[in-house]
């Protein structure tokens, strides 16, 4: 792994700081397609629909399932948001294989998919990515399930469903209670992926949304509800 493929800790917005007196937004990217493949020449790569169509067909897999780029897009959207820079966002990734990954709010995810893929291969192999500046800081790490053990006891848990009542995210978000939104990080599928966790299902648009846009709308809603500029 070349050095510039590694995640780096952020600058002044290093947000391992938890603002306990303020509500927080938690986002869980569910059904994330993060799976490694080792070729005959012993090279390991992140399985994806662009580079491994033939391999996926041989496996009898739906090519549309191998979309790690969706997780990449969501992470860039979430970590660039003002609510993350304010220290009030925590992101988790739950893969299709039920691997739970904790994302440090200060991590700088590589902008290119190629470098992101290399980072994910390293993470899934080593189970942790540490800061280059401080070996005690985990930027990405695999943690034990279930994700609910990392949420506040009074945290409202919600997922998005096109069939549910449409409302603006800021209407759902209160001014004092933390909320965890479960977002499907897949190209298509049913909205039942988080039924075991959630209290509510809502729709936030009259139109189908990509996972990245759904993340963006919820972040903007929280920023409006909690006066984050």
UniProtKB/Swiss-Prot annotation:
EC number of the protein: 2.1.1.-
Q: Where does the protein end up? A: Nucleus, Nucleolus
Root EC class? transferase
Catalytic reaction list: a pseudouridine in rRNA + S-adenosyl-L-methionine = an N(1)-methylpseudouridine in rRNA + S-adenosyl-L-homocysteine + H(+)
Asked if the record carries the keyword Methyltransferase, the reply is yes
Got a GO cellular component term for this one?
small-subunit processome
Output the InterPro entries linked to this UniProt entry.
Answer: Alpha/beta_knot_MTases, Rbsml_bgen_MeTrfase_EMG1/NEP1, tRNA_m1G_MTases_N
Keywords for the protein's UniProt record, in alphabetical order: Methyltransferase, Nucleus, Ribosome biogenesis, RNA-binding, rRNA processing, rRNA-binding, S-adenosyl-L-methionine, Transferase
Site-annotated residues for Interaction with substrate rRNA: 67, 108, 111, 115
| Entry keyword Membrane | no
Q: Which domain of life is it from?
A: Eukaryota
Q: Which GO terms describe its molecular function?
A: rRNA (pseudouridine) methyltransferase activity; rRNA binding
- Which terms under GO biological process does the entry name? rRNA base methylation
Q: Which residues bind S-adenosyl-L-methionine?
A: 160, 184, 189-191, 204-209
Site (Stabilizes Arg-67) at 69
Which purpose does this protein serve, as stated in its record?
Answer: S-adenosyl-L-methionine-dependent pseudouridine N(1)-methyltransferase that methylates the pseudouridine corresponding to position 1189 (Psi1189) in S.cerevisiae 18S rRNA. Involved the biosynthesis of the hypermodified N1-methyl-N3-(3-amino-3-carboxypropyl) pseudouridine (m1acp3-Psi) conserved in eukaryotic 18S rRNA. Also has an essential role in 40S ribosomal subunit biogenesis independent on its methyltransferase activity, facilitating the incorporation of ribosomal protein S19 during the formation of pre-ribosomes.
Q: How does it assemble?
A: Homodimer.
**Assigned protein family:** Belongs to the class IV-like SAM-binding methyltransferase superfamily. RNA methyltransferase NEP1 family.
Q: What is this protein called?
A: Ribosomal RNA small subunit methyltransferase NEP1
Name its species: Candida glabrata (strain ATCC 2001 / BCRC 20586 / JCM 3761 / NBRC 0622 / NRRL Y-65 / CBS 138)
